[in-house]
Amino acid sequence: MQETNVVVAKESDTVTSISGIRLIGDDVGRLRSDNAIELSSGIAPAKSQYSSFPYWTGAFVPKLPWRRPASDELDSLLGSVETAQPGRWIQVIRIPKEVVDLFAGGRIASKNSTDHKLREYTSGSECREAILKTVKYVGALTWPEQPNIDRASVFFKDPGLPTTTPRNYPELLGLHIDSAYHNVPFEERNHVPMRISINLGLNDRFLLFVSASMDQIHHMLVDRKIQYSMQSSVATHEFRTAFMSNFHDFPVVKVRIRPGEAYVAPTENMIHDGSTVGQTHFDVQFSACGHFRPQCSSIDAAAAAFLSAKLLKDQRAVPLQAKK
């Protein structure tokens, strides 16, 4: 199924959403003008929309067609660095060429028609060395109080996927919430480590996300008296299913991530996935978790200190920990 048709929303056509997770940055205004953002028509069961893709029975995906957001929707989605709230901000940043070029072998391998060369590359010493050097770079993007980097790796995905995360290969999971720190209660997810994902490939890739954090979704479910299991082993599945089954008109945001760009996002605190629709080569990305800070060159030391106090959870910031 193609996703090339995009409509433009008028103010009166906009779907009700909430002011939750926002795209922030010094240059966030560019997202208004370069067609980097689209909104879905809602959320749909994957099997009803993509019969030719191997989605598992309980998967959900953004509902087609995509459309350009109206100006009031962009006002809700975009903000300056100073507007960032804990666990409710996403930033698209440019990665230095010298960092991206560490993975030149992966880009070359991504041009092949099969994944054989990519498997060789990602399991080899060249890739491991590039990961170690990149960990040092992304470590400098964290808060000084929480400098550690965890779960650094390089992944590759097939081109042309509406969503990219597997469940039990070859099944696709669909829109989901990450569970690396699954023992952290929902109400504490605003302070877990965020994820950085660098586009190392040759084509644009996309971040898909619901612009409501887990605590906001919880309140939406409570308001409608919708119940879900809080058992830790199934909580995020039950939680996201309860939301997506009952709020099927809620739009999913699609953000373009160009080669050499990265997103920083609270993937433990939002329903999301990636997409490789439109790619002609394998998708390659570096991914790692850490307590990343918003990247900004326009605020002074006092403003930076205020932002740190607002976004960091004092001395109780969630430490990096192994999944149990």
Q: Which residues fall in each region the model found?
A:
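Fe(II)/2-oxoglutarate
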Residues: M1-E98
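Compact, glycine/acidic-enriched structural inserts
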Residues: N112-T114, Y121-S125, K136, T142, ...
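Double-stranded beta-helix
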Residues: D204-A262
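Short linear interaction motifs
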Residues: P170-H191, T236-D249
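Short, conserved beta-strand element in jelly-roll/cupin
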Residues: V192-D204
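Catalytic core of Fe(II)/2-oxoglutarate
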Residues: A242-A322
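Extended, Lys/Arg-enriched charged tracts that mediate electrostatic binding to polyanionic substrates
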Residues: Y137-F186
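Extracellular structured ligand-interaction cores
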Residues: I18, P193-R195, V252-K254
